[in-house]
Amino acid sequence: MAIEYLGLSEINGPLVVLEGVKNASYEEIVEFHMEDGTQKIGRIVEIYEDKAVIQVFEGTDNMSLGNTHTRLTGHPMEIGLSPEILGRTFNGIGQPIDGLGEITPEVSLNINGLPLNPVTREYPRNYINTGISAIDGLTTLIRGQKLPIFSGNGLPHDKLAAQIVQQASLGADSDEKFAIVFAAMGVKYDVAEFFRRTFEESGASDHVVMFLNLANDPVVERLLTPKIDLTAAEYLAFEKGMHILVILTDITSFCEAMREVSSSKGEIPSRKGYPGYLYSELATLYERAGIVRGGTGSVTQIPILTMPNDDITHPIPDLTGYITEGQIVLDRQLHGQAIYPPINVLPSLSRLMKDGIGEGFTRADHQDVANQLFSCYAKVGDARALASVIGEDELSPLDKQYLVFGKAFEAEFVGQSETENRSIIETLDKGWELLGLLPREELDRIDTKVLDQYYRETVR
């Protein structure tokens, strides 16, 4: 039975304190009824003796200490879901904002989800094609993987996210059901409108579920958006048998919201002012990716985060790296050279790539091509460093060939237009074309039989 209380003992930013509480539960949803007839919703975030600290989703404006009626609902926050959510746009707490009316829920699920039993997890296999060579060829995204994008302020991660949404697929030969669940947290209105317009104009919106939390929305809502987004993804994957790609941008906004709320609660801060439980909170999001043994669906994650001051050792990218299975790093220097997407392939990594590529998945030579491209591009850095000391004219003919290869690799393999959707075969063929700029004897990471089949000298 729901219990109702009259009055609050304290209001502090987005938090209120209720005294004399009985049988309250952590994460329980609370309803507030103000004297002017308006209503608000919150959730219990801390319980101490008979006191409950409650986060108010819509902010604490118009709330008074004496005349606010508080009702404990007795259950955590849930979201109503059905297949109708495909093609729809919601706000950060799951309310439709596209003018198409309410959905008819088939089921209501707790947004905190249920942890996947490690024993029931299936090891990720097979790949998701993004149409972007630097990702598909060198840091391949595997179904069930969590592969973050490390970006920085001013870099085109929004444009890259939109391109992935438009182009992502399970491959030309797959007839399995595929959809994207997209969440934007703390974004400006023009960025949200860019995503909405881009998805609609490209026709991608039909297989996209979008959750938008704007910069002027309550900060508490930002903490719920990724959980609601992932709950929708789990429903489509594990109950409807679909392969779901989840894109979360910007995780940094989520963490900053957590820091703000933690400060309001008077908690002792940890690194850079973030709460000590930042790691566990990020883990509760990232670990919701995966495949359940015996099921047909999967949840794959691409969380996008902006590194403050491009610092990869900042707590957010640092802790993210511990939890996830690799990273894709955007580079400001490449962006300054007008290379899009500005992916720096050397610090980028997909730890599960080896198990979802090759014969039966992409093409038999995929791993060899990737290894050789990494090796050759690393030598480009050595040649450039030497040229900066002695001058390019003094380099050996081989070092000059590496400089030519490096320039072509950045412009033609890493670089592509935002509307160019390359198949995995086109990506691998492009890799062989660029390797043809170097002498065959330099390709020491590839078996002789594979070289005989694919290597052709490229003359320019």
What are these regions (language model features)?
Residues G137-V459:
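P-loop NTPase catalytic core
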Residues A2-E4, V16, T38-K40, H75, ...:
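Residue-level detector of functional hotspots within protein domains
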Residues I11, F90-G92, N129, I135, ...:
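Short glycine/serine/threonine-biased micro-segments
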Residues T70, M77, L81-E84, P96-K146, ...:
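P-loop NTPase nucleotide-binding/switch module
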Residues M1-E4, E10-T130:
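Acidic-enriched and Gly/Ser
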